[in-house]
Amino acid sequence: MIRSYTSSYQKPTLWVEILITLFGIAGVLLFLAYYETAFPDASVDVTLSRGQAEQIAARQLQDLGYILEGYEFALSFSSDSQAAYYLQRTLGVEDYNKRLATEHWPIYYWSARWFKPLQKEEFRVYLAPSGDFLGMHHILPEDRPGAQISQTDAQAIAESFLSQRMGWQPDIWERVEASSQTQPGGRVDHTFAWKSNNFSAGEGELRHSITIQGDQVGYAGHYIKVPEAFTRQYASERNVAGFINNIAYLVIVLGSMMVALVAIGLSRPEASRAVLPALLVAGVSLAAYLNSIPLYKSSYSTTEAYSLFWVNRMIGIAFAVLFSAIQTFILLVGAQSLSRFVWPLQDRILARGQDRWLDFSRSAWRGLMLGGVQLAYVALFYTFTANLLGWWSPATSEYSDIFATPLPFFYAFNAGLSASIIEELSIRFLGLGFLLWLFGGKHRWLAVLIPALFWAFAHTGYVTSPIYARGVELTVVGLFLGYIFLKFDLLTTIVSHFTYNMVVTGIALLRSSEEYYRISGWVVIFALVLPLLPGIVVLLRRGLRTEPPIVEHLVISLFEDSDLRQLCGLPIKTDWHILSRQGNRTILCLRAGQEIVGVVTGYLDMTMGHIDGIYVAPRWRRQYWGTRLLDVIEEELKTCGASEVRVLVRPNEHRARSFLHNQFWSTGVHVLTRVEKKQSFKASMKNLLSELKKEKPGDYELELPRNLE
């Protein structure tokens, strides 16, 4: 009896890898070529660092005579999303980008804030990405006393401020609003608004608004007024899109967790392999949250106790990080469990074998290139749907608080890593895998389509027009990633997903004129190639020193007398001379070339087969050789006349029990032994301590060794 097996199920075809590489490079080039056309806000250039923005904003207030000593400071980078969406839908993405670059609309801005806890009075300054002054706000209590000047005098103060501070030219601005209000403290506040006669974009208006508090400027704003009809339509669309998004997201989260928990309950896998990825996701998430701590001050309400505000924030961070770790852990263990039923003797996350680090980097390279294909697809999708169908989506790079964090690249890391790992485990592995299991391996196209649809429409929360545009776009991506997963492995789809998220987030950093942001952008790019390093190291080591060739095929065959010397050299506590002479015993050897790297043995007692030992050398563990040895000897014992095959496992051999359970062996006979009729507390504790101190069985003592799959 001789059985031959390959040492790794994944054998990449060179021409396929070359083709993927060429498509990936072409994809990146297409993405860059169509970036300006397809992606809104591609013309934004953030030229200020955090420190520079703080200095300029503080100088603006100091020039107005305000003293900021004793105030807490917060800085954020934000946008007027309503105005941006209206202009993009009205003008089209390409025209919007061109006019945004030349007319410098007040869409994106730095927001600098000075406040004191539990005090209403505070200051805000708004700056353009280039540092130009966009406005300010001095928030005062309503009962603060102040001057009571006429509206005419107040307008003169307002116009003087606009002319000196904001380059306002009265001949191109038309006043559209003027109102006055007496505050409880007796102060009279006057508000004025002007619209530009040179601005044309649908029914939108470019405005200056200013409020005079008593005889001082209390508020100055430069903004685009969006028509109320658009605001109402937009809110209605967002309600429908949000409902679809929430339903799809709920199905994904609950469905994937239920599948994972059921698979874990049926399989009881070893969970240690999921710890490191879960810690990685939690670590990156924690780093991103800590990196965002300076932003939290921007959302502080001065009616809340400052210490309580920070306690609540820290608790929120702890729960968010813990949840991401637990979710990743459960999904990963569930994926390993489900693979027992759908892909036996395969690791669909990453191929196992002697070349596992080379396979890891090969999958990472493949995912990197396929991420380039995704980038090109999205750019082309919105370019052509906008021109042919009138569709629109701000599928834009992340111009947001990423610029206001100390280490901007952590924002991209978190957006890339957490989403890619959790979503690919939930959708591609557990969703697709469960449907394959449910359909008995049939209807593969349906098993790929259904998760892709749910995943796509779980992104309808993104702003698009029509609201299903994002769903259509990502359904194609979901089908693509599902096919890639079935063709290769989950790591390929994770890296592809990771690459796309990282690039669309990090490209804003690379396009900035500020050196620090560009360096952060290159850190993001460098992170994309990190998964290639293990394979490069392996290749360098092989090139620098002679290593024995990788064994491509392993053989399972019956014991021969010439094997006795090698068997005696294995770290197994038994007498092979005696065992090999037992007429009712079967011994099978796992051979890698001339070397015996594993063995399994069992015997026949009447019509009952017993497996009483199995061993695989450490180098070959976690590659399913233990499973193959177990299957082959069971078949061999039944061929010899066994009507049933059993394995004896002691109560403390938990890993052996888990290993057998994973191979769908179940408990058939319970053997109970009585220790004492009654034990005192002291005797019970003594027995417990002795059990804890008891040495674990070795690799061979009437038990299955651990860690063999």
Feature locations, PLM:
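Transmembrane helix-loop-helix hairpins at the membrane interface
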Residues: 379, 392-548
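Core alpha-helical transmembrane segments of integral membrane proteins
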Residues: 237-411, 415, 423-426, 436
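Extended, hydrophilic extramembrane loops/domains of integral membrane proteins
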Residues: 199-238
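Acetyl-CoA-dependent GNAT
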Residues: 568-612, 630
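Conserved acetyl-CoA-binding loop-helix of GNAT-fold acetyltransferases
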Residues: 616, 622-635, 662
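Exposed beta-strand-loop-beta-strand "reactive/processing" segments of non-cytosolic proteins
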Residues: 7-14, 31-36, 63-129, 174-214
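Conserved GNAT acetyl-CoA-binding A-motif
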Residues: 637-649
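Conserved active-site alpha-helix within GNAT-family acetyltransferase domains
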Residues: 627, 651-669
